[in-house]
């Protein structure tokens, strides 16, 4: 889990496109805090802080504290909008949470040991089916990423959720099927059976 942080914010007295454009001209981004059966709270946060938090990674899996006047509100960033042309943030949605909250969150998938994966060393291609996995997790213990070790995968293998060790109290939202996260695809012009034969030959040679 990434380290929590604090964002300073100001209440927005006005909402709408005109007000939002004015905020952005002055270095702020319009945002809203919602959830926990409370009325939505319209706020403005620093453009620079949000920009760096988003592009540093882990933005939507890290709990933050928003300081608004005398209030300190624990939140989880749930969504953000980017300018369609220039890719800078223009709006953020925050969900109210507590230390006891359990939330649905998209956790990124990270693959490691590509350099030792048998399938990739033989020219196979890592075909990522899911870059993120929708999970249910405690708000105060959301993992930064789901780590998958590729060192034992060969060409033709599939990586399913059932073989992934998730952190304690983290479960996938999808429970009715063993969905695929990634596969090791054969390179163009190669059949999976060719690689299987080569693997068997390697094993036989190792025994002699």
From Swiss-Prot:
Gene3D superfamilies, per the entry: Ribosomal protein L25, beta domain (2.170.120.20), Ribosomal Protein L25, Chain P (2.40.240.10)
Keyword Disulfide bond annotated: no
Pfam families: Ribosomal_L25p, Ribosomal_TL5_C
Cellular component GO terms held in the UniProt record: cytosolic large ribosomal subunit
Keywords, alphabetical: Ribonucleoprotein, Ribosomal protein, RNA-binding, rRNA-binding
GO molecular function, one term: structural constituent of ribosome
SUPFAM superfamilies: Ribosomal protein L25-like (SSF50715)
Keyword Mitochondrion included in the entry's annotation: no
GO biological process, one term: translation
InterPro entries tied to this protein: Rbsml_bL25/Gln-tRNA_synth_N, Ribosomal_bL25/Gln-tRNA_synth, Ribosomal_bL25_b-dom, Ribosomal_bL25_C, Ribosomal_bL25_long, Ribosomal_L25_dom, Ribosomal_uL5_bac-type
UniProt subunit comment: Part of the 50S ribosomal subunit; part of the 5S rRNA/L5/L18/L25 subcomplex. Contacts the 5S rRNA. Binds to the 5S rRNA independently of L5 and L18.
Classification via HAMAP family: Ribosomal_bL25_CTC
Similarity comment: family membership: Belongs to the bacterial ribosomal protein bL25 family. CTC subfamily.
NCBIfam families noted in UniProt: bL25_bact_ctc, PRK05618.1-2, PRK05943.1
Function in brief: This is one of the proteins that binds to the 5S RNA in the ribosome where it forms part of the central protuberance.
Record-given protein name: Large ribosomal subunit protein bL25
Origin species: Bartonella quintana (strain Toulouse) (Rochalimaea quintana)
Name of the encoding gene: rplY
